[in-house]
C-alpha cells in the first residue's frame, strides 16, 4: 500500500474513533460511563466531572438561538418555555424589549450569570442551564435563587412564583448530614412542579462540568445554593440549603421524556451530555442516600434503558438481595364427574378416580 494512502487511512480511522467516542449513542451509556464504576466520594465527583466534559464545544452565546431549534421544541413546533404558557414560533419574537408575558423569549441563565462573573463564555453559554424563557418572567426572576415560595408577590401565567422562602426538608442520609432542613433568606423563585427536576439536574450537571475550571457560582444570591468547595466537607459544591432543595426536586420530579430528548439534542449541538439525566441515581451517590459508597453500575439503569419509565423511574434497580421473595401456592385442578361406559369416574387434571376415590389412572 502506498505510504501516503496508508497514512490517510490511519488518519481517517483515528478521526472516526474520536467521533465515535465523543458522539456516543444513548444506547451505549454503560460504556460511556464505565469510568465512574466502583468510584466514591471525591474520586466519583472527579470522574463524573471528566465524563461531563467529553465532546464539549462552546456554542457561543449567539449560537443558542439556533441550538434551541434542536433542544427546546414542543410537540406543536413552538419553543418549550418552562416559565410561562407562551407558545413562541421558532425564530420569531426573540427578545428584544418586553412589557408583558408572551411579548418575546430570551436566553435564561437558570444559574444567573451574576453568580459567576457576568460572563457569556464558558458556563455563560452552556445550554444545559441556559433555557429559552419568556422575557417578562425571566426579568421578574432576576438573579434570585431557586426555592419554594411561602407567600407569592408575583405569579406567572403557568404558575411560576416569586416570593419569600419556605423551609426545605429532606429525610434520611445526605452528604450534608441526616434529615436536613434549611431556608433561603430573602426572595426565591419557584418554577412549577413539572419542571423542578429539570432545573435541579441542570444545576447538578452544569456545576459538576465546570467545577474544575474555577467556577464557584457563589457571587450574590448564588452563595445560598453553591458552596464553591468541591469536597465532601463542602457538600461537593453545594450549601446545606442547596443539597436540600436540589435533592428534593430531583426526587419528586424524575427524568422525563422531554429531558431525555433535550439531553440527546444537546449532544448533537454542544457535544456533551448531562450525567444526571443519563444516570439519575448518580445524584444519590454524590449528594444523597448513597453518599460515600462506591457506585455499582450493575445496580443502576440509564434513562435510555427499556426498563426505565420516564417520569417514574429513579434509575435504581438494586441487586438480588433487594428482590422480595414470593411464594406461589399450588393451583389445584377442578374435579369433574363423568359417566363413562356406565361407570362413574372423577377426573381431576390428568388423574382419574373411581366413585370410591381410588386412583385408577395417573
Residue spans of the language-model regions?
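N-terminal secretory signal peptides that target proteins for export/translocation
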Residues: 1-3
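Sec-dependent N-terminal signal peptides
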Residues: 5-14
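N-terminal signal peptide c-region/cleavage motif recognized by signal peptidases
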Residues: 15-20
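N-terminal module-boundary/linker segments of secreted carbohydrate-active enzymes
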Residues: 21-88, 285, 292-295, 302-305, ...
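Short, His- and charge-rich active-site/binding loops that engage polyanionic ligands
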Residues: 79-81, 86-104
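Domain-level detector of nuclease and nuclease-like folds
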Residues: 97-106, 111-318
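C-terminal outer-membrane/trafficking sorting elements
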Residues: 317-362
Amino acid at each position: 500500500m502506498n505510504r501516503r494512502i496508508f497514512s490517510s487511512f490511519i488518519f481517517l480511522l483515528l478521526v472516526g474513533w474520536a467521533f465515535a467516542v465523543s458522539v456516543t449513542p444513548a444506547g451505549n451509556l454503560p460504556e460511556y460511563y464505565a469510568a465512574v464504576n466502583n468510584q466514591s466520594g471525591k474520586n466519583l465527583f472527579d470522574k463524573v466531572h471528566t465524563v461531563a466534559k467529553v465532546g464539549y464545544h462552546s456554542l457561543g452565546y449567539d449560537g443558542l438561538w439556533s441550538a434551541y431549534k434542536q433542544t427546546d421544541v414542543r410537540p406543536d413546533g413552538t419553543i418549550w418555555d418552562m416559565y410561562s404558557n407562551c407558545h413562541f414560533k421558532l425564530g420569531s419574537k426573540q427578545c428584544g424589549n418586553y412589557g408583558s408575558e408572551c411579548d418575546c423569549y430570551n436566553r435564561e441563565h437558570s444559574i444567573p450569570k451574576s453568580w459567576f462573573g457576568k460572563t457569556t463564555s464558558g458556563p455563560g453559554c452552556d445550554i444545559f442551564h441556559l433555557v429559552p424563557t419568556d422575557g417578562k418572567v425571566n426579568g421578574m426572576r432576576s438573579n434570585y435563587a431557586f426555592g419554594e415560595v411561602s407567600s407569592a408577590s408575583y405569579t406567572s401565567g403557568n404558575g411560576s412564583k416569586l416570593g419569600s422562602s419556605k423551609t426545605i426538608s429532606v429525610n434520611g442520609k445526605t452528604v450534608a448530614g441526616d434529615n436536613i432542613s434549611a431556608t433561603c433568606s430573602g426572595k426565591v423563585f419557584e418554577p412549577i412542579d413539572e419542571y423542578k427536576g429539570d432545573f435541579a439536574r441542570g444545576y447538578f450537571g452544569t456545576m459538576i462540568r465546570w467545577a474544575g475550571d474555577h467556577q464557584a457560582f457563589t457571587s450574590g444570591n448564588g452563595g445560598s445554593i453553591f458552596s464553591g468547595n468541591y469536597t465532601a466537607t463542602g457538600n461537593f459544591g453545594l450549601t446545606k440549603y442547596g443539597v436540600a432543595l436540589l435533592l428534593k426536586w430531583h426526587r419528586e420530579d424524575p427524568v422525563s421524556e422531554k429531558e431525555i430528548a433535550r439531553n440527546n439534542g444537546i449532544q448533537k449541538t454542544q457535544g456533551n451530555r448531562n450525567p444526571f439525566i443519563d444516570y439519575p441515581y448518580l445524584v444519590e451517590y454524590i449528594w444523597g442516600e448513597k453518599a460515600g459508597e462506591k457506585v455499582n453500575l450493575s445496580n443502576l439503569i440509564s434513562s435510555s434503558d427499556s426498563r426505565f419509565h420516564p417520569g417514574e423511574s429513579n434509575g435504581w434497580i438494586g441487586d438480588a438481595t433487594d428482590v422480595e421473595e414470593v411464594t406461589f401456592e399450588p393451583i389445584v385442578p377442578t374435579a369433574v364427574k363423568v359417566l363413562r361406559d356406565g361407570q362413574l369416574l372423577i377426573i381431576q387434571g390428568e388423574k382419574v378416580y373411581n366413585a370410591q376415590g381410588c386412583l385408577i389412572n395417573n
